[in-house]
């Protein structure tokens, strides 16, 4: 297997395993247990200097040379370019894919991630303010997506890496206190993608130590 996915059972980790399954690329998972500080292991930091999961190592990279890639958006883009899948060849077709990929990376990820953070806080004063702020922003972003998906099956003109990027975070909607029934277009899109066999395999691959 040429690709090693260094990851854990999180939205950002799952969107890469989903993409790999959809692209039909062989890969193996190297679990990075972020609950035990595994992301700070020097070997992982050499791949992902931030250090956050996921990262990949492709032993058959460009010109046949090994390459490592960190940041989930960059990984999705790399895999799309490597395989010629889920990213249109023409610039005009690439624009909406990249727009919604950046929408996810820059907003729909950080906001629900903060919801999860404040839910876990024990200080009620800090929790109340932070949870109200980021829950409202998360719901606003869901509303943006819901409006965009009206009459559409995908975020761009066809299934793309933008869908995989968003899917990883919608997967955790209940944890972020979002009822998808409030956003019927997102719910329809989500249920359709989750019914795909490759997507199901991507969410089933073990990303925690037994």
Regions found by a protein language model. Name each.
Residues 1-129, 146:
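GST-like domain detector, emphasizing the conserved glutathione-binding G-site
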Residues 92, 101-197, 202:
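GST-like fold's C-terminal all-alpha helical module
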Residues 206-210:
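Conserved histidine-centered catalytic loops in small-molecule metabolism enzymes
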């Amino acid at each position: 297997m040429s690709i090693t996915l260094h990851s854990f059972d999180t939205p950002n980790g799952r969107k890469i395993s989903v993409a790999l399954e959809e692209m039909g690329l062989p890969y193996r998972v190297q679990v990075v247990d972020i609950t035990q500080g595994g992301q700070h292991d020097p070997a992982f930091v050499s791949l992902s200097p931030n250090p956050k999961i996921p990262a990949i190592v492709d032993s058959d990279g460009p010109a046949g040379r090994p390459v490592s890639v960190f940041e989930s958006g960059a990984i999705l883009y790399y895999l799309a370019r490597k395989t010629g899948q889920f990213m249109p060849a023409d610039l005009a077709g690439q624009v909406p894919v990249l727009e919604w990929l950046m929408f996810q990376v820059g907003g729909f990820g950080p906001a629900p991630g903060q919801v999860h953070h404040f839910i876990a806080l024990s200080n009620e004063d800090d929790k109340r303010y932070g949870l109200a702020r980021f829950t409202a922003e998360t719901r606003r972003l869901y509303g943006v997506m819901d409006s965009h998906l009206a009459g559409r099956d995908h975020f761009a003109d066809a299934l793309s890496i933008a869908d995989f990027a968003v899917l990883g975070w919608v997967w955790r909607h209940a944890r972020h206190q979002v009822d998808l029934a409030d956003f019927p277009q997102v719910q329809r899109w989500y249920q359709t993608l989750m019914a795909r066999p490759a997507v199901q395999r991507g969410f089933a691959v073990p990303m925690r130590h037994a």
